[in-house]
Design a protein with these regions (language model features):
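Solvent-exposed edge beta-strands and adjacent loop segments
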Residues: 1-76, 124-131, 193-217
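Short strand-edge motifs at loop-to-beta-strand transitions and within beta-strands
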Residues: 137-139
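Beta-strand elements of well-folded, non-transmembrane domains
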Residues: 15, 65-69, 156-158, 181-187, ...
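Small/polar beta-strand repeat architecture
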Residues: 142-162
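Extended beta-strand solenoid/passenger and fiber regions
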Residues: 70-130, 155-191
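Beta-strand secondary-structure signal
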Residues: 60-64, 151, 178-180, 217-221
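Mixed-charge, glycine-accented linear interaction segment located at domain edges/termini
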Residues: 141-144, 191-240
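Extracellular Ig-like/FN3 beta-sandwich strand-entry sites
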Residues: 58, 145-149, 174-176
């Protein structure tokens, strides 16, 4: 039969070993499933191709999520999404008040900070930093002038809602991935669902376009079930 493709409803990946859900994306754009075949030409003495031997097949599923997806990023870098206390370096641009004091935007770790004077346009007036003292969530700048702007650099303790760490020695997990696709039958526009069932790893070559219209692209390289029937992909279609 022939079908009109309406849209891809979702793509989900689970750990091939323990079945844990690794990512779910339901704002899919630009999906594509491609197959490849490695071949070798058999030639005669005159270099005429007399036969083509097939050595192996491959499959790749690629798509983008319309929004940045932390689960996909974690799967791409071989990490996981965590939460909780963590430390970051904060860069606060503050306007000094009475006594050269200003309130910090986050909870500081320790009492030390580096302060840089800023010009009216927000640029650094000097590369030299002066020391400041942090106490009760405030920075105090010695000889600070009320109304002047400063850049305060300090170590902050924050409670992260989500955190993804990319390590140089991390390995991407083997996963089972299913894409759910909405189809319509051509004659009567009856609904059908296609399930593209795959097994493989997300590519570690990932790019997060940090713009308002930047999509989160990902690519799955499919692997055959080597200890099974060497299957690469199943496409299962059912009536809605």
């Amino acid at each position: 039969m022939e079908y009109a493709l309406d849209r891809v409803l979702s793509v989900a990946g689970t750990d091939a070993v323990d079945g844990k859900v690794l990512f779910l994306a339901d704002q899919i754009v630009d999906p594509s499933l491609s197959f490849s075949s490695e071949t070798e030409d058999i030639v005669d003495a005159m270099n005429n191709v007399v036969m083509v031997l097939e050595n192996g097949r491959g499959a790749t599923f690629s798509a983008s999520n319309a929004f940045f997806n932390t689960q996909i990023l974690a799967a791409q870098v071989g990490g996981e999404v965590t939460s909780g206390a963590t430390e970051i370096t904060k860069y606060d641009i503050l306007t000094l008040g009475e006594g050269g004091k200003a309130k910090l935007s986050a909870t500081a770790k320790g009492t030390d900070a580096k302060i840089y004077a800023l010009a009216k346009d927000g640029s650094l007036t000097t590369a030299e930093a002066v020391d400041g003292t942090i106490s009760s969530g405030e920075i105090t700048v010695a000889d600070g002038t009320k109304g002047s702007k400063v850049l305060v650099v300090y170590t902050a303790e924050i409670d992260a809602d989500e955190k993804i760490s990319a390590f140089a020695d991390a390995k991407n997990k083997l996963m089972n991935v299913t894409a759910e696709v909405l189809l319509k039958e051509l004659c009567n526009e009856e609904l059908y669902y296609a399930y593209i069932i795959m097994r493989g790893k997300l590519s570690g070559e990932a790019e997060w376009g940090m713009t308002r219209d930047g999509n989160h692209a990902f690519e799955l390289r499919c692997f055959p079930e080597y200890c099974g029937d060497k299957k690469l992909v199943d496409v299962v279609i059912v009536k809605g």
